[in-house]
Amino acid sequence: MVEIWRQQQRFPSLASTVSVSILEDTVFSKPYFEAAGMILALKDDQPLGFVHAAYATDDTGTDLEKSAGVICQLRVVPGEFAEEVSNGLMQAAIDYLKSSGSKTVHFGSKFPCSPFYLGLYGGSRVPGIAEKDEQASAVCKKFGFNDTGEIVVFRRSLVGFRTVVDRRQMKVRRAYQIRADADPSLQSWSEACTMGKNLRMRFSLIDRRNDSVRGSVSYWDMEPLANSWGVTAMGMYNLNVDDAARREGVATFLVGESVRHLASQSIGLIEAQTAATNEPTCGLLEKLGFERYAVGRQTVLSLV
């Protein structure tokens, strides 16, 4: 697998290098890894490609959802037989998932959950098929995967970052404060499996009036992928604010203050991903100076 990965055409959402130890951390050590879902293509003992089929986690993040299969990765060595190998691997993966009871197959992730390769593919999340992943796009099109939505990838350089300052935000600041927690407790089994070894930060929104938590946002270090970009970066995830508090404009305060704190810790870039249909989050990020960097595609194939 390391040799296959080394020969891939480069694009920003694919880690430039991997090693046996990195694959152990991001793939083989997961408690739900099944060797039968890792399918290799060889010719005269030479690796031509691999596909990894697995399952999404359920909405609670506490167990696998075997009815929802995921093609986590499909990587093929460029060359004369690349298309033939890619098609053969995809068919083998689909057959494996169907025999295991899957009713649907997603590529990359059932957003925002991806059981493997976080830190090697995508960014702050695995957005399905990453932009510029021509290999994945071609094989999914051939096998009849249907697009189900777009995931917008936002990025914000923290050079010279300034949070929003206006009358409304000054009022919010008087009513709320931010608590920063390094290496916070893991919020789900799924988070423990995919991010448990990474550096993480959580920022909580505290109501000064009663000391209650009204929201939070988390970040992780996106390694080893961020190392390929040559910048110290963190990925935003799990932004949650009480509906009543959100109407007060506190989401802007929470995210802005958390980003300001990270900038003070020499973080150079923040990435966030959200569904293109999530207009409130898209608007919030753009208000804070995040720019639309790329688009991922969610795709699904029905097996029934």
PLM segments and residue spans:
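A conserved beta-turn-beta hairpin within the catalytic core of GNAT-like acetyltransferases
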Residues: 57-71, 81, 223-236, 246, ...
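Conserved beta-strand in the GNAT
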Residues: 38-40, 46-56, 70, 204, ...
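Conserved acetyl-CoA-binding loop-helix of GNAT-fold acetyltransferases
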Residues: 81-98, 241, 247-264, 282-287
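Conserved hydrophobic beta-strand within the GNAT/NAT acetyltransferase core sheet
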Residues: 105-107, 236, 270-274
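Short amphipathic alpha-helix that is part of the acyltransferase structural core
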Residues: 1-26, 38-40, 146-153, 160-195, ...
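Conserved active-site alpha-helix within GNAT-family acetyltransferase domains
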Residues: 99, 112-147, 252, 276-294
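A short, internal acetyl-CoA/4′-phosphopantetheine-binding micro-motif in the GNAT/acyltransferase core
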Residues: 71-83, 109-113, 238-247
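A structural microfeature
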Residues: 49, 144, 149-152, 214-215, ...
